[in-house]
Every structure is written in C-alpha cells, then in structure tokens.
Amino acid sequence: MSDPTHREVESQNDKPLEMNWINSKGEEIYLLVPKTVYPPREDTELLDLCISKIGNGNGRKLLEIGCGSGALSISAANNGWRVTACDINPLAVVATKGNAERNKVKLELFEGGLDESNSNSDFLHHFENDGPFDLIVWNLPYLSPPLEGEPRLGPLEDAGLIDSEGNEGWGEILLNLINQKPTLLKKGGAIYLLHTNNPRGNLLQSTWRQSLWATRIVGENDLEDGERLTYFSA
C-alpha cells in the first residue's frame, strides 16, 4: 500500500519522536511527537522568541491555531499565558495534551480549525467561549497547494502544511473572520502570523493593511534554501 492515506495510517505504528526542545528562555520542554504531527522547527523557535519579547503573560489569554506538538503553547503557558490551542489533526491534539501533562502545564484544547467559509460552528463555539483573546498566533500552513497530478502528502499532513486551495489563503480567511467577529480579539490585542516568501505570503501584510489593520514585522529568519520566514503582528 503506497498511497499517502495508507502511508499515514501505517505510520501511526511507528515510535514517536522523542525530543527535548529548548525554548527562547532556555527552558527544556520534553516532547513526544507522532508521525504526521508537526514538530518544533525554525519557525516555531522564531514565534516563541517573538512571544517572549512581549513579556510574561500575567494571565492574559492566548490562542494558538495549529498547535502541532504543543511546544509553543506549553512554552507560553510556562510564561504566564492562559492558553487555548487547537489543531485539525486529531493526533496533534492528543500529542499536545500528553506533552502538556508531561510538562505539568494546563491548556484548553480542542480539535478543529478554520474552514474556507468560516462556517465551522464547533470551532467558532470554542473561539467565542474561550475568548476574547489578547494574542492569537498561527504558524500558517505555507506550502503552495499541489497542482493537479502532482504528488500529495497524506490527508493529515496536507491539512496542516498546505495553504488553502481556494482564492484566499488561510491568513486572509482569518482576517475575514476577525473582521466579521471583532470581539474575538480583545481591545488592544494582537495577532501574530508567520508567512513565507511565496506569492501569497508576500502579499499577506498588504492584504491586512487594506482592511485597515496596522502591521509590523516582529521577526524574520532566512533559511539555507533561500526561504524567508516572516512573523508580523496586526
């Protein structure tokens, strides 16, 4: 069985990756990361550093969309944020729950995420009940959707790593949601998003500014392959 879906199913029997991740404050976070779940990488480290520059959360509310292994949410909770985290990959939610327990932090967790029409009632229910949030962070799926006939990842990896196949990318879909429901973000709150230097990413900040949001770059990282990761706040 060689198709992506079967490979994903078979990979769940593999031993999860064990790692000790060091956050921007030098704190060690022990993680078990199953296959198909996004582990902490350069982009995770960059966003963790950006959040740490805000200072201690002091009980303020943070929402992480697409929590993956939970590394970022656990780091934020360790530093005083009240964290709600979600992921559309059920294995990521399970991994984050287990990793939070291993590191003795409390998170609010749910399975789900945005959809292209912003009509996911379960996600909106959690979003509205747990908010308003002082900070919303999302390491956006930034791989370009494959063209017809090109190889795909498995369904879970596709959902977590590949940008929306519609006319709008996930960063713009989130913008539409916040504009429709501004009370999800606390007055004076901020949104931190990562984008890469692909065509959609290069336009994302100007798209937010066209909707009268002020944006500023809070962190950048140039990778060896020429890719540039940029975090901006709105």
Predicted regions: what is each one?
Residues 2-79, 95, 115-119, 217, ...:
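SAM-dependent Rossmann-like transferase core, predominantly class I methyltransferases
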Residues 26-27, 103-107, 213:
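A short helix-to-beta-strand connector/capping loop
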Residues 39, 90-91, 199-200:
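Short alpha-helical
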Residues 45-149:
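Conserved SAM/SAH cofactor-binding pocket of Class I
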Residues 79, 152-156, 208-211:
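Glycine-rich, phosphate-binding/catalytic loops in enzymes
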Residues 121-122, 147-152, 204, 228-229:
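Short aromatic-enriched loop/helix-cap "lid" or pocket-rim segments at secondary-structure transitions
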Residues 140-173:
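Mobile active-site "lid"/loop adjacent to the S-adenosyl-L-methionine
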Residues 169-231:
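Conserved Class I SAM-dependent methyltransferase catalytic core
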